[in-house]
Amino acid sequence: MATAVWAAARLLRGSAALCARPKFGSPAHRRFSSGATYPNIPLSSPLPGVPKPIFATVDGQEKFETKVTTLDNGLRVASQNKFGQFCTLGILINSGSRYEAKYLSGIAHFLEKLAFSSTARFDSKDEILLTLEKHGGICDCQTSRDTTMYAVSADSKGLDTVVGLLADVVLHPRLTDEEIEMTRMAVQFELEDLNMRPDPEPLLTEMIHEAAFRENTVGLHRFCPVENIGKIDREVLHSYLKNYYTPDRMVLAGVGVEHEHLVECARKYLLGVQPAWGAPGAVWMLTAQWHSTRGGSSRWRETCQMSALRPPRFQSSHIYGGARELLLLEEDFIPFAVLNMMMGGGGSFSAGGPGKGMFSRLYLNVLNRHHWMYNATSYHHSYEDTGLLCIHASADPRQVREMVEIITKEFILMGRTVDLVELERAKTQLMSMLMMNLESRPVIFEDVGRQVLATHSRKLPHELCTLIRNVKPEDIKRVASKMLRGKPAVAALGDLTDLPTYEHIQAALSSRDGRLPRTYRLFR
């Protein structure tokens, strides 16, 4: 018993001693287990004895110059050096779906799928890929409405091989019957996938261009129509290539290469070379200049009268409203880009984290005030001689009329007072996006190639940033007012039972408040 009492007393004394011992040092110093101390300085105060850091300053000026050389045959060679072992280079051609007015629609789509197939030097696509693999390279071909781009990223040491391969792919494709038949299957599959895709954006983009430009230049279909898949053959492709794949319509662009070496390779493989389709001709040559275009509407109704095994694809209604830009003045391009950034927008649900563009007009005026809106996003489609500023909105089919009225009000407000705070925020976002994208080598390549193809020169990032900073509220009002004087373009997808007529939408855009004309029905 005495032993137990003594043990309990000793335990209590030990606990008291432990409780009395301080867990930490004094407020100014803390103690290591070894007995040493270190100063307890808050993280908001600089450490004593540490030199002040010198941060790098960003002036937006690139360290390497963009050089352009024109060969005797008219082909332009543009390059910009960049630190690193790898390079990105390719051939950009002034061709695309906008030049298919006198041809079967879908040729550019076919050529995109046929790219990097067998050529005069390479028996198959596998042989091309194996050749690129020796230099750690990858290849790709992309076509848009006004540009076709063949690109390769590879080790800079294989520059001569890559330029020779690109020249062979562009100028000497075999276009065998087997390859064309495989391309027909690939195009058919892509069209089926496009029609089953839950995202309506690609279809709406095609529809709004068709509504705005009406079978004219950029209004022509970018994808091959189903009825033309079986009609496009080698003869049709050669006829198109003969007119548009000419040296004066091409740019060989490279990033991460020496300009003199690139020019030397271009002279070796692209100067005085006879293409597979023979001498160039201009039987059906079309210029990029667009003719009389007008606004309009494009609809695709999809109702519930479908098989029970396949519910309607679009259970919401999608409206794509736009107005055509008259970009005949080069100085209008930057204000339109700032206006698009100022409108901003997005979806009602963001999987990428909160806070992106939450102060843009479409977020503040539309998504934050109307909980039933699924999406409200501004898009800017820009081309050499024209453009299109659009707003994509989606909501429940029962809210279609109200949604259209909200969007027409936002279009009218574009030409009204511009707040300086929102303008500065939009300009800062645009410059930030520009500089962030130009950190990527493939993006620099595309920027160099497209600018030289369109203007024979390149505006450097710091020049573009200066133009963006100089945009004033009067510039936004000027370009918006000029845009709204034209006829609107409307594309609609989904259940469109309550969609207002095109005439009512046009009347709303011509009014002061953007309200649709009231309609009265005796029976519902």
Swiss-Prot record:
Its main location: mitochondrion. The modification N6-succinyllysine is found at residue 63. It comes from the Eukaryota. One of its GO terms (cellular component) is mitochondrion. The keyword Transmembrane does not apply. The keyword Membrane applies. It is found in: Mitochondrion matrix; Mitochondrion inner membrane. GO terms for biological process: protein processing; protein processing involved in protein targeting to mitochondrion. Residues 1-32 form a transit peptide. Belongs to the peptidase M16 family. Substrate recognition and binding subunit of the essential mitochondrial processing protease (MPP), which cleaves the mitochondrial sequence off newly imported precursors proteins. Heterodimer of PMPCA (alpha) and PMPCB (beta) subunits, forming the mitochondrial processing protease (MPP) in which PMPCA is involved in substrate recognition and binding and PMPCB is the catalytic subunit. This is Mitochondrial-processing peptidase subunit alpha. It comes from Rattus norvegicus. The lineage of its organism: Eukaryota, Metazoa, Chordata, Craniata, Vertebrata. The gene is Pmpca.
